[in-house]
Amino acid sequence: MLDDLPEQFDLVVIGTGFTESCIAAAGSRIGKSVLHLDSNEYYGDVWSSFSMDALCARLDQEVEPHSALRNARYTWHSMEKESETDAQSWNRDSVLAKSRRFSLDLCPRILYAAGELVQLLIKSNICRYAEFRAVDHVCMRHNGEIVSVPCSRSDVFNTKTLTIVEKRLLMKFLTACNDYGEDKCNEDSLEFRGRTFLEYLQAQRVTEKISSCVMQAIAMCGPSTSFEEGMQRTQRFLGSLGRYGNTPFLFPMYGCGELPQCFCRLCAVYGGIYCLKRAVDDIALDSNSNEFLLSSAGKTLRAKNVVSAPGYTPVSKGIELKPHISRGLFISSSPLGNEELNKGGGGVNLLRLLDNEGGREAFLIQLSHYTGACPEGLYIFHLTTPALSEDPASDLAIFTSQLFDQSDAQIIFSSYFTIAAQSSKSPAAEHIYYTDPPTYELDYDAAIANARDIFGKMFPDADFLPRAPDPEEIVVDGEDPSALNEHTLPEDLRAQLHDMQQATQEMDIQE
């Protein structure tokens, strides 16, 4: 196929990770000619989702010096005990038999319902390519147990984990946080400016349990977090409540690997060309035309702009990698927490874990079959923490012991791996734009900011991902753009249109 490609492009994007796919879609959407290449045979790179077989094959792959996925290992476990209520006995063979029913993320994320990504998906109309599942519970560990943190007003008053007094205190505190910012000169802002958010909580005389709820699950901050940042995080949480469910979070159906592909679809709709299993062998800058010359599979391509993921170009492959994110991925035949957290066959839950000193943290995402990420009767646990070493199992040991040592979770499969990042920025002497690797964050804010920044440098006067019209809104040459297809309108607008037409007819009769 590469032989049939045009030789000239406005933009060549190398790598199909989330950030690269955003940039490719944004370029194609404003009418730029885009070529999107990836040396892998699948979309997404470390942002991808895999079937069970494909994940094992990926973890078994020999690690190349520039590969972002490293230190990988996995283990199949024999079941120590089987529940009498289990409809199916799970083991390695039965799990692999349903390999295609799995969608296992290397780099899982949760979306704030009013966060940057959701707003971008709606604004650009890319949301039509994606489906989401509301997260059922935001949890924390309290006195050795996993408990649900009440988010909405109804949750607060229905929860059995708080006393009546604590419920009132929590509602009063959340109301104060929600009002913060409307008057930045209020007494609290002045009194606690330069102090910590924990000091503010203590001054409100909330109980230890409420303080844990706020610090661990709502603001998701630490003892040294400033008052201003703690308020901003709490407001972000509250601002996403009540949109799509009881919690402020969403998870992509069929795994996070669907999201880069959503942007790739938009890029292709607007003329972007895709070539998988195609590497770039060499890149040079033509000093006369100020264009890039890219050599790939024996063909020379010309591009005005080049964007690449780290490690995908010859010049960036020599950069040393260092551990960045330590990951654990587990498959179990039973969920974490009590029955209340897992009604109807298992909840989609989020849990923030802290070490004993509170200096380190990890995020756990529990997925059930309701997300389309695994077969019914199985559960996926995604565990993520900033890397401290080349041994992800050691980095995560303090958290896995909290989760599994005293729980009834029946682990069938466990895997550990590291997502690495370059120890220094890729050389930019040739003016190639290199995207950042995945960072340790809950949502996609950093990746979107990175995509916006690179796009703005290439096309400073262009809008980043303007709304794409729906198919019925597209006017073909020769059609009357003012003509409306009544059947494509919502019912209320159809009624208004009918009334307007009748009124017009009556005016004609009167005249």
From Swiss-Prot:
It is found in: Cytoplasm, Perinuclear region; Cytoplasm, Cytoskeleton, Spindle pole. Disulfide bonds: none annotated. One of its GO terms (biological process) is small GTPase-mediated signal transduction. Its main location: cytoplasm. GO terms for cellular component: aster; cytoplasm; cytosol; membrane; nucleus; perinuclear region of cytoplasm; Rab-protein geranylgeranyltransferase complex; spindle pole. Keywords: Cell cycle, Cytoplasm, Cytoskeleton, GTPase activation. InterPro entries: FAD/NAD-bd_sf, GDP_dissociation_inhibitor, Rab_escort. GO terms for molecular function: GDP-dissociation inhibitor activity; GTPase activator activity. Signal peptide: none annotated. Transmembrane segments: none annotated. Binds unprenylated Rab proteins, presents it to the catalytic component B, and remains bound to it after the geranylgeranyl transfer reaction. The component A is thought to be regenerated by transferring its prenylated Rab to a protein acceptor. Belongs to the Rab GDI family. This is Rab proteins geranylgeranyltransferase component A. The gene is Rep.
